């Protein structure tokens, strides 16, 4: 899995570098790249979010998914201006490979909070037409289930 992680990271970095006219690095191949996969690509600068775009479901080949999400995070995240060439050396790229979403069964909010596994679970929160998503790394900033869910609900506008 570490080898696949390095390949995905190189694909993401290469997609951004190529769009900016910068040199790219050699990248290996893996059968997993040709199977459907879902990724999120997160860009940070000095610990601050700079872009994050991804796919919640696997609907295209994994290699294509990571490249497209890297480009979208760098150049089309509506929260930020497009990444500039001068920013690239200071931009950290992270690729999250998602597993298929699983529905949670719970009786109330306390039951839902008790089922969450800090540092492991990402959550897709949906109520009516409101929806928000947190990846597992968000637990680093919101370490308790109560904080995690409160911010997730706020992000959904609830």
Predicted regions span which residues?
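Basic nucleic-acid-binding interfaces
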Residues: 1-158
């Amino acid at each position: 899995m570490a080898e696949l992680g390095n390949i995905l990271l190189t694909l993401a970095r290469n997609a951004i570098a190529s769009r900016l006219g910068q040199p790219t690095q050699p990248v290996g191949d893996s059968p997993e790249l040709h199977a459907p996969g879902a990724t999120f690509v997160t860009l940070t600068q000095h610990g601050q979010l700079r872009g994050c775009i991804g796919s919640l479901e696997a609907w295209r080949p994994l290699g294509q998914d990571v490249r497209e999400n890297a480009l979208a995070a760098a150049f089309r995240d509506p929260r930020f201006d497009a990444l500039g060439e001068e920013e690239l050396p200071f931009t950290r790229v992270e690729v999250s490979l998602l597993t298929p979403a699983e529905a949670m069964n719970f009786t109330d909010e306390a039951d839902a909070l008790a089922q969450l596994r800090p540092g492991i679970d990402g959550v897709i929160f949906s109520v009516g037409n409101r929806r928000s998503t947190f990846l597992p790394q968000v637990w680093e900033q919101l370490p308790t289930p109560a904080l995690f869910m409160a911010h997730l609900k706020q992000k959904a506008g609830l």
